[in-house]
């Protein structure tokens, strides 16, 4: 396994990231629909990832399953929470396979690794194998969250990033950064260019859930929040350009 010392420094010497985890919401995959998968959206995401790989950036992806199932919402409707969460995990795998298909159509070797064993469609999650795939220029897509209920795919993204030695978690959202309130409801909302983890937690800002933010804070792992569907934004984010909001240690 490679030496991971200094793996979470904000940028490498040439100003970009070398290895990143791209966190995508399941809702994004649905496009303008509330459920299902939009080929147009997945194709756009795959093309952007392919461009990043062509530039030598190692890209791993974690996808939510909200376009299929949301465990927390199902449990509110009376379903047992653990079972609902497992349904959500299976939904993430559907999204992973869709993205894999679009990437491979573009000639990008892709591996799906899941936290729940399903050997007919994906590899089991093995960190050292994931790192080796990335070093070979393959995209690795992590599915089924952490394989345990009560943990979000945000937390899975943070944990996977730490374990494979990624330099940042890049979270693609429907807005262009982190605001002090919802900009879709409040035209006067103020966007932050930079935040530290404690500020995110104490103010309850919508970056990631508290568990994921705390995990990143404890390990100095930067989080970049950006507008997923903005033209060229995925490539800009993975190249380490200034975009959206960065959450990082205050002294970096």
Swiss-Prot record:
It catalyses: UMP + ATP = UDP + ADP. Inhibited by UTP. ATP binds at residues 23-26, 66, 70, 173-174, 179, 182. Pathway: Pyrimidine metabolism; CTP biosynthesis via de novo pathway; UDP from UMP (UMPK route): step 1/1. It is found in: Cytoplasm. It comes from the Bacteria. Its EC number is 2.7.4.22. GO terms for biological process: 'de novo' CTP biosynthetic process; UDP biosynthetic process. The keyword Nucleotide-binding applies. UMP binds at residues 65, 85, 146-153. Keywords: ATP-binding, Cytoplasm, Kinase, Nucleotide-binding, Pyrimidine biosynthesis, Transferase. GO terms for cellular component: cytoplasm. SUPFAM superfamilies: Carbamate kinase-like. NCBIfam families: pyrH_bact. Belongs to the UMP kinase family. This is Uridylate kinase. It comes from Thermobifida fusca (strain YX).
């Amino acid at each position: 396994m490679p030496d991971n010392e200094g793996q979470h420094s904000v940028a490498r010497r040439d100003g970009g990231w070398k290895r990143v985890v791209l966190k995508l919401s399941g809702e994004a995959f649905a496009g303008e629909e509330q459920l299902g998968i939009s080929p147009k959206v997945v194709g756009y995401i795959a093309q952007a990832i392919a461009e990043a790989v062509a530039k030598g950036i190692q890209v791993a992806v974690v996808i939510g399953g909200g376009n299929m199932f949301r465990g927390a919402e199902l449990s509110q409707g009376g379903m047992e929470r653990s079972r609902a969460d497992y349904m959500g995990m299976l939904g993430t795998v559907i999204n992973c396979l869709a993205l894999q298909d679009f990437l491979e159509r573009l000639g990008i070797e892709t591996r799906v690794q899941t936290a729940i064993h399903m050997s007919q469609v994906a590899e089991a999650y093995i960190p050292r194998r994931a790192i080796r795939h990335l070093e070979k220029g393959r995209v690795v897509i992590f599915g089924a969250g952490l394989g345990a209920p009560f943990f979000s795919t945000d937390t899975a993204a943070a944990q996977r990033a730490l374990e494979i030695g990624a330099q940042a978690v890049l979270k693609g959202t429907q807005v262009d950064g982190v605001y002090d309130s919802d900009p879709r409801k409040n035209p006067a909302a103020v966007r932050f260019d930079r935040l530290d983890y404690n500020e995110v937690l104490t103010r309850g800002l919508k970056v990631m859930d508290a568990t994921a933010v705390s995990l990143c804070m404890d390990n100095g792992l930067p989080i970049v929040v950006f507008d997923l569907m903005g033209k060229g934004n995925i490539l800009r984010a993975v190249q380490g350009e200034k975009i959206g909001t960065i959450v990082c240690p205050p002294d970096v």
